[in-house]
Amino acid sequence: MSVRLHTSAPNKPRKQRARRVLSVVAALAVLGGGLAVGGSLAYGAQGRAGHRDAVIEGAKDLVREDGFPAVLAAVGGRDGRVRDYTVGTGDLETGAAVPVNGRVRAGSNTKAFTSAVVLQLVGEGTVDLDEPIETYLPGLVRGDGIDGSRITVRNLLQHTSGLPDYTQSLPPNPFEIRDTYYNPREMLDLALAEKAVFEPGAKWQYSNTNYLLAGLLVEKVTGRPFGEEITNRIIRPLGLKDTYWPNAGERDIRGTHPKGYGASTPGSPLEDITRLDPSQAWAAGQLVTTPRDLNHFFSALLGGEVLDAAELKEMTTTVPAAEGSPTPGTEYGLGLFRTPLSCGVDLWGHGGSIHGYETFGGVTDDGRAATVAVTALSSAVAADLDGILEAHQHVQDLVDTAICN
C-alpha cells in the first residue's frame, strides 16, 4: 500500500467582502480488492504521523469495512495549510487511482450556497426572512394543509415549513431516472400533491422542497437564472475554481473526478452512475465541487466574506435538528448544520447525498476545516437501515477524527 505526501502552502489572506461588491435518512434517500492510499500532507510528515495515520486508517475502514469504492478528504489547519487524502479506487472497471481533490457532486452542500444567496438578497432589502413565501411566489404554494401565506422564507431555509419532501415521490431506483430532466415546477408539484407534514414552525424536519422554493424565490426577485446568481454571487467572488453549476441537461462531470457508484436497491451490486442529470436536485443539491473548495467556501462563509454580520448571525441562529441526524445535539440554522464534535468544538457545515457521492464536513470557530467525500451513497453500500445509518455515521466520524486528532 503506497502513501503519497506533499506540502501545500496556506492561501493568502482574503479580503473582507464589502456590501454588494461580492455581491439524515430522508436526505440520504436523495439525493474487497487492492487498496490504494494517497495523501498530501501540508504540515509535513515530521511530528504529525499520529494525525496522518488516524485519518488514513479511518478512510481505509470506509473502503474495506463499509464498502465505499473511494474516499477523498481535505483537512485544513488553523494556519491555512491543507492535507489531501485519497483511499480506494477511482474507477472500479479500470482500477484507476483516486484523483487528489477530484470533483464530486456536492449534493445538499448546495443548500448552504442557496441560503447564502437568499441572505445576500435579505441584506440588499429585496427579501424579508419573516415575509410569507406567498409574497414572492403568489398562488404557487397551495395544497392539502399547505398555505404559502403561512410559510415564511425563514421556515424554508430553516426546514420548519412542514412541506413534504418531493424526493420521496421520485422513483427509488436511481438508474430509472439518471437521464431524466426535471424542471423545478415539476418537482414542486410532486411535493404539493402530498399532505402537509406539520404546521409551519411547529417542528424541524428536513425537506428538499424548501430549497426548491428558495431557488424559485431567487429567480423571481432577481429575474435571472438561479445558476447564474449562485455563480456570480458565490462561486466567482470566492475563486472556487473547481466548483460549478451544471448547465441544463449536463450529465457528465467536468474535469478530473472519481467515478460515482449506485445500487438499484440497497446493498445490490454497485454500478457506475457518474453520468447523471442532476436537475432532480436543483437548488437543493445540483452543484459540483471538490473537498478543498467546500472547505474554502465554509471558511469564507463563517469568516464573514460572503454575508454581512446581520445576515451571518441569522444564518447561524439554530434550532434543534436531532431528528434524522445520527449525532445527538445537532442543530440547524439557515442552510447550516452545527454538529458537536468529540473534542468539544462545533463543526459548522452541511453535507450532501446524491446518487454516486456522499459528503460531510465543515469548519470550526478556531479555523480548522475538513471535508470527506465517498463515491457511493450509504444507502448503496448497505442493505438495511441499520447498515445505512452505520455507514453514514462512519463518514461523519472520519471528519471528527480529522478535526479532533
Locations of the language-model features?
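Catalytic loop of the DD-peptidase/beta-lactamase superfamily, centered on the K-T-G motif
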Residues: S2-L5, G32-Y85, R275-N405
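N-terminal export and membrane-targeting signals
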Residues: S8-A29
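Hydrophobic (often cysteine-bearing) scaffold residues that line and stabilize catalytic clefts
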Residues: H51, V55, A106, T110, ...
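Residue-level preference for non-acidic, small/hydrophobic
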Residues: A59, D79-G80, K111-T114, V118, ...
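Short active-site loop at a secondary-structure junction
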Residues: D66-P69, E93-L156, F198-S207, W282
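Short linear capping/connector segments at secondary-structure termini
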Residues: G76, T89-D91, P132-L140, L170-F175, ...
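N-terminal, post-signal-peptide region of Sec/Tat-exported proteins
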Residues: D79-A97
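Short, surface-exposed loop or secondary-structure junction motifs
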Residues: G145-L347
